[in-house]
Structure formats: C-alpha cells, structure tokens
C-alpha cells in the first residue's frame, strides 16, 4: 500500500513539473475549440486531483488501521505465546516434581528392601548354622548308636514291651466293656426304680440312710481300734529298741560279771515282749436307734455296709501275722485320755482326727446321725504296756 501511495504522489509531482516545463503552445486552432479543450482538460485535472486526495486519505486511514491491527496481532501473539509457555513450564515443573518424589520413594523402598534382605540373610545364616550343628550332633549320636549296636547285639526288650502293651490294651478294653455293661444295668435299674411307687422309693431312701449311718459308725469304731493297735505297736517297738540298746552296750565281760538282778530284768523284759504280741481285734457293734433299741434286719442277705466292714476287718487283721483273740470277758475297748495326745510325747506318732459321720454321707442330704455306742473301759493290754514303760 505504501508503494502505491508513493507512486501516486510521484505521478502528481511529475505532472506539476511537466506543467512548469511545458510552454503553452500557440493556439493554432480557432478560439472556440481551444476553449473547449482547455475546459475539458481543467475539469479532468481537477477530478484527478480529487481522486488522488481521496485516495491519499484512504491510504492514511488504511495505514493507521494496518498499524492498529498489527499491534493487536502482536499483542495477541505475545499473550498466547506467554500463556502457553507458562502452562508448559508449570506442567514440566509438576512432572519433574512428581518424578523426584517417586524417585525418593523408590530409593526409600529400595533401602528398606536391602535392610530386610540383609536381616533375613543373617537369620537364615544363623538357622543354617544351628541346623548344621544339630545335624552334626545327630550324626554323632547315630554313629555312637551304631557302634553300641555293633558292640552289643540288639535285645528283645521291645518285643516284651510290645506284648505287655498289647496285654494292657486288652485288659483295658475288657474293663471298658465291663463298665459299659454295668452302666447299662444301672440305667435299666434306674428306669425300673422310676417306674416303682413313691412309697417304695421312700423305703429305699430310708434303707440307704440306715446303711450309710451303719457304715459310718463301723468306720469310726474301726478307726479307734486301729489307733489302739498302732499305739500298742509303738510301745512294743520302744521296748525292743531299749533291749537292743542294752544288748549292744553290754559286753561279754560285763555279762559274765553281771549280777543276778540284771538277768531277771532281761527276763522280765522278754516276758513283756511276749505280752506285746497281743493285738486288738475288730468287733462290730450294732448301732443304736434314737429310742435306745438296737437295729436289726429281717432279711438274711448281707448289706453293702457289712461287706465294707468285713473288708475293713481283713485289713486290720493283716497288721500282724499271728493274731490272737482277746478273751471275751464282757469288756471292750474304750478310748483312753492318753490317746488324744502323742504317745510318750513323741511328735512322730500324731494320729489324724477320726472321720465324721456327716463327711461319710458322700454328698447326701444332712440327716440325723445315730449315736455311737458307749465303749467299755480300756483293755488290760494297754494298761500293761503303760506299766512296762513306766518301770523302764
């Protein structure tokens, strides 16, 4: 556009200079024709001037507009380029930051994994070492066992043990079968008892209570007799110990020079020892009812309490090999005041308290226990033992 404007201006300037240079020719024509042509030229010239001026104005306006648009475009381009660059820079910075964070996290994870691997390697090495030691120990044990087996031929003890174990298992199986049979029998009896009348149940309960009271009384009586037997044995052992002490201390020379009184004392002691062989026998007394009458049973079949008493009597009679019966002169054993204390103030002979009738009820309801029969005075054997000890 500038080039076009410059060309127009140059044309105008050239025309002006040409006009100045040209000399008006002498009119060859007549006056009317020259005037008309001159007027046409002037009008054409003026039109051309007007057009040139208008074109110059348009050119200036266009230049201004072009400059404004150029500035606007440049500003827009700069803004676009600056915004895009900032966004890209921000994106790149964020990406770089994320990459750095990931790198740090991966480094920390790698360090942890390295530490864990090192610790696990240490633990595995220790375990391997311990296992190797155990293997060495086991190998040595196996080698020693092989050597022992080579030296000593294998015995048949394991066969004997196997047979004994089989016998035990067989016996236990038989016992289990018996217990099952007993359990089934008891269940059948229980069902039958449930089907019976309540009156019969009351009778059975009363009989059970009477049996329990009888067994408790018999047990107490057996306990006191056992206590007396133990006291007699204690006295006999003391006399024997004294005799042995005398025999050890006395030498053969003293025995030769000893007076007649010493031999008499030894004879007396030996007679005392013969007297000590008497033991207490167990006599079962029927318990008394609250009305003072003795309890008697019409049936001839023995009660479970009687069987228990017989077993207790057998245990008591096993204390001595040659048991003699004490003459039945109407007197029975009675608890002496000295039996509550330790015999001869010896702490090693302390007897436990007798079982109570309430404790032998085996979880039954508390009932009124039958009173024990009054025991007669002490037998002459206990008094004889005490007299012997007093003299010694």
Swiss-Prot record:
The gene is AZI2. Ubiquitinated via 'Lys-48'-linked polyubiquitination by TRIM38, leading to its degradation. Homodimer. Interacts with IKBKE. Interacts with TBK1. Interacts with TICAM1. Interacts with TAX1BP1. Interacts with CALCOCO2. The modification Phosphoserine is found at residues 318, 353. Adapter protein which binds TBK1 and IKBKE playing a role in antiviral innate immunity. Activates serine/threonine-protein kinase TBK1 and facilitates its oligomerization. Enhances the phosphorylation of NF-kappa-B p65 subunit RELA by TBK1. Promotes TBK1-induced as well as TNF-alpha or PMA-induced activation of NF-kappa-B. Participates in IFNB promoter activation via TICAM1. It comes from Homo sapiens. Residues 1-197 are annotated as: Homodimerization. Residues 40-76, 102-196 form a coiled coil. PANTHER family: 5-AZACYTIDINE-INDUCED PROTEIN 2 (PTHR14432:SF6), PROSAPIP2 PROTEIN/5-AZACYTIDINE INDUCED GENE 2 (PTHR14432). GO terms for biological process: defense response to virus; dendritic cell differentiation; dendritic cell proliferation; mitotic cell cycle; negative regulation of canonical NF-kappaB signal transduction; T cell activation; type I interferon-mediated signaling pathway. Widely expressed. Abundant expression seen in the pancreas and testis. It holds the Pfam family TBD. The keyword Transmembrane helix does not apply. Residues 216-257 are annotated as: Interaction with TBK1 and IKBKE. It is found in: Cytoplasm. Keywords: Coiled coil, Cytoplasm, Host-virus interaction, Phosphoprotein, Ubl conjugation. This is 5-azacytidine-induced protein 2. GO terms for cellular component: cytoplasm; serine/threonine protein kinase complex.
């Amino acid at each position: 556009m500038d080039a076009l404007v410059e060309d127009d201006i140059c044309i105008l300037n050239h025309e002006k200079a040409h006009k100045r240079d040209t000399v008006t020719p002498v009119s060859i024509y007549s006056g009317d024709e020259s005037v008309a042509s001159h007027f046409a030229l002037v009008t054409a010239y003026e039109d051309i001037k007007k057009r040139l001026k208008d074109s110059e104005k348009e050119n200036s306006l266009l230049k201004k507009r072009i400059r404004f648009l150029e500035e606007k475009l440049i500003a827009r381009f700069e803004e676009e380029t600056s915004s895009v660059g900032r966004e890209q820079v921000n994106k790149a910075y964020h990406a770089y930051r994320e990459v750095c964070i990931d790198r740090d996290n991966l480094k920390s994870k790698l360090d942890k994994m390295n530490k864990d691997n090192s610790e696990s390697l240490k633990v595995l090495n220790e375990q391997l070492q311990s296992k190797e030691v155990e293997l060495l120990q086991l190998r040595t044990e196996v080698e020693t066992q092989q050597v022992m087996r080579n030296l000593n031929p294998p015995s048949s003890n394991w066969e004997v043990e196997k047979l004994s174990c089989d016998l035990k298992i067989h016996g236990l199986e038989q016992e289990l079968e018996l217990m099952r049979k007993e359990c089934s029998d008891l269940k059948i009896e229980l069902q039958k008892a449930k089907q019976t009348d309540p009156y019969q149940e009351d009778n059975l309960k009363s009989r059970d209570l009477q049996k329990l009271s009888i067994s408790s009384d018999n047990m107490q009586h057996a306990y006191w007799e056992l206590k007396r037997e133990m006291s007699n044995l204690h006295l006999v052992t003391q006399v024997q110990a004294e005799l042995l002490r005398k025999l050890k201390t006395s030498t053969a020379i003293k025995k030769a020079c000893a007076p007649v009184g010493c031999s008499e004392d030894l004879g007396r002691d030996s007679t005392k020892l013969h007297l000590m062989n008497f033991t207490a026998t167990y006599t079962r007394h029927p318990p008394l009812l609250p009305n003072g009458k003795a309890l008697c049973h019409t049936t001839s079949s023995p009660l479970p309490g009687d069987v228990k008493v017989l077993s207790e009597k057998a245990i008591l009679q096993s204390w001595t090999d040659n048991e003699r019966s004490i003459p039945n002169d109407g007197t029975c054993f009675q608890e002496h005041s000295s039996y509550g204390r330790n015999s001869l103030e010896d702490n090693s002979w302390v007897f436990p308290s007798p079982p109570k009738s309430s404790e032998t009820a085996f979880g039954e309801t508390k009932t009124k226990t039958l009173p024990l029969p009054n025991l007669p005075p002490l037998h002459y054997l206990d008094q004889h033992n005490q007299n012997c000890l007093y003299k010694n």
